[in-house]
Amino acid sequence: MNNKLVSHLLDSADPAVRAKAIEAAALARQWARPIQQELSDKVYDTLAATVCVIAPELDVADHALLVEYSLWLYLLDGRLDDFEHYGTRPEDVGRRVIAVLRGGRAEARADDFFETSLAALVEELRARDGCCGLLERFVLRLVDGVRAGVRQAALSRRIAEGAEPLPTMEDFLELAYRHVNYRSVALALLITVGEHPDSAAQERLDAALVPASRAVRLANDLRTWAKDAEEGTLNVVQLVAHDGTRMTPHAVRDRIQAYRDEQALLLDELHRSAPASAAALENNLRVAIDLYTVDDLQFDLPDAEQVVG
């Protein structure tokens, strides 16, 4: 585990947490062996360190499951973003994912790791969830994320072709925060935490994931604005709000903090009824945002201010 992100996450961690991260990364590498050529080697260590810091109390099997689902989302993004490489239209990818979510292993094509691994991941989450109801929310949020990803890929293509103008910041974010799939990842985390909150608490937890997802999407765009500009990918830093405000990096940071505050307010009353779940979501967002401040993830933001005027 020798990369800057892992060091940032684990340098101050308990030795037991470091050991769990190493084991979870090894299990994830074994899981991903059929498609290892699609993933960079350091992503296993980074994701394992991340989930172990977010929820150190979980056992290694739960950590590995969360890493594997995160890796599956990497595969999903690749298929939605790179039609030429995979030869499958984003719309068809979306239809297959939704079909597998509805039909399980019986629907998954046996020779397609992308589909069979999704069916297996959902089965593992279902076994941990029991009859709590979080799995149903997980499936709904993943379906919504897939549909948003398909729509965003189509929108980016139309804008690149000059067939559609740039959206406002608000219109873009309404689609982009769903595409980032933070909500399904967070719900998978809640399932592994195993607190089994009641339906009222679940509603509150689910609601808190909306501002959290927006904060994460904005933090991601703040990090990748230069690369996105080169590749012609939509990024909030190039957009204008409904009120005419240009989205400078400073304005984006302010909105990130506002969304973090909104999540904190929604979670505040859950510290009695669902304390473990609320704490997990707070820690999840804190770590997610923190990762975007690591030096090797940052771009030169003063130059960004000049670019957007």
Model-derived regions: residue spans:
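Alpha-helical, largely C-terminal catalytic domains
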Residues: M1-G309
